[in-house]
Amino acid sequence: MTDKTSLSYKDAGVDIDAGNALVGRIKGVVKKTRRPEVMGGLGGFGALYALPQKYREPVLVSGTDGVGTKLRLAMDLKRHDTIGIDLVAMCVNDLVVQGAEPLFFLDYYATGKLDVDTASAVISGIAEGCLQSGCSLVGGETAEMPGMYHGEDYDVAGFCVGVVEKSEIIDGSKVSDGDVLIALGSSGPHSNGYSLVRKILEVSGCDPQTTELDGKPLADHLLAPTRIYVKSVLELIEKVDVHAIAHLTGGGFWENIPRVLPDNTQAVIDESSWQWPEVFNWLQTAGNVERHEMYRTFNCGVGMIIALPAPEVDKALALLNANGENAWKIGIIKASDSEQRVVIE
C-alpha cells in the first residue's frame, strides 16, 4: 500500500449500496403492515406511534426474542422465506397471552456480508408475520459486520410492543380448581428445541430434504413457520372469560404452564386427548428421546394452553375452531399443594 491508496468502507467489507438496495426492495412489503396509528414513514431516526384511542387505561406490554438454532437449519437448507414469520410469532404470541394487542414490531438483522436476496426474503417473512398478527413493522437495523459472522451467516432478533386495557390484563390470578384447559394445535416444533433437532439429524445421518414424512420432506415439517395465534386469541378474550394462557416455548409443558398458575393449583393434562404430529414421533424415535425430555423440549403438537371456566368451554372451542384453529379440551385445573405443578397422565 502506498500513501496515495484511498480506502473505502466497502474495502473494509461494508457495502452501503447493498444496504440501500435492500431498503428499496423491502419498502413495499413493509408499507402493507402499516396501521393508522403509525406516524411518519420508514427511514426516520425513530418510529412514532400514537396509542389507539379506544383504551381508557392503556398498559404497554413489550417483548423480545429470536428463533434460536432453527436459523442454523434454515441457513444450511438455504430456506429463508419463513424464518421471519417465526421471529414475529415468538414475540407476538408472548404478548397476546397477557391479553395484549400487538401494535408495532422492530427487527435486528446482523450478518458478516450482506446478501440482499437473503435479507429481503427474511424481512419479507417478518412483514408477513406482522400482517398475520395485525401489527406494524415500523423499523429495524441491518448490520453488516465483517469479522463478526462467518461469510453470509446471519442472526435475527425481534422486538414488539403491544397494549392491553389495565382492567383486562390476563395474569393467571383468576385460575381456580375446576377450570378447564383448552389446547391450540401447533404447526410443528415452532422455534424451540432445534439444537436437539440438529443433534438428532446428525446422529441419525438423516438428510431432511430427501427423507419423506407424511408425504412431504422432513425439512418442510422442521421449517414450518411458527403459528401466530394473535387474531384468534384476541377474539376469544373479547367474547369468553379467559383466566390464563400459556405459550409453550422453551421448557415445554413442564416450565411454561406453571408460569401462569397461582399457588396451590395443578394442571392435569390428558395425554390421550391428542396424537402427536408425526414430526415429534420421528424426533423421539430417531433420537431415542425419553418422554419427559420430549415434553420439556418440544411443544409436541400444542402451541398454547388456555385456562377458562367449565361453562365457557363449548363456546370457546366453537369460536376457536371457526377461526381455523385446531382446538380441543386437553385437561383441567385441580387444587393441589404438590410441588409438581403439571401432571401428564
UniProtKB/Swiss-Prot annotation:
Superkingdom assignment: Bacteria
- Give the EC number: 6.3.3.1
| Compartments where located | Cytoplasm
Q: Which GO terms describe its cellular component?
A: cytosol
One MF term in the entry's GO annotations: phosphoribosylformylglycinamidine cyclo-ligase activity
Q: Does the keyword Cytoplasm apply?
A: yes
Q: Which Pfam families match?
A: AIRS (PF00586), AIRS_C (PF02769)
Q: In which pathway does it act?
A: Purine metabolism; IMP biosynthesis via de novo pathway; 5-amino-1-(5-phospho-D-ribosyl)imidazole from N(2)-formyl-N(1)-(5-phospho-D-ribosyl)glycinamide: step 2/2
What catalytic activity is recorded?
2-formamido-N(1)-(5-O-phospho-beta-D-ribosyl)acetamidine + ATP = 5-amino-1-(5-phospho-beta-D-ribosyl)imidazole + ADP + phosphate + H(+)
Tell me, what is an example of a GO biological process annotation in this record? adenine biosynthetic process
Q: Which interval of the chain is the signal sequence? A: none
Keywords, ordered alphabetically: ATP-binding, Cytoplasm, Ligase, Nucleotide-binding, Purine biosynthesis
Q: Which cysteine-cysteine pairs are annotated as disulfide bonds in the entry?
A: none
Similarity annotation:
Belongs to the AIR synthase family.
**Name of the protein:** Phosphoribosylformylglycinamidine cyclo-ligase
Q: Which organism is it from?
A: Escherichia coli (strain SE11)
Lineage of origin: Bacteria, Pseudomonadati, Pseudomonadota, Gammaproteobacteria, Enterobacterales
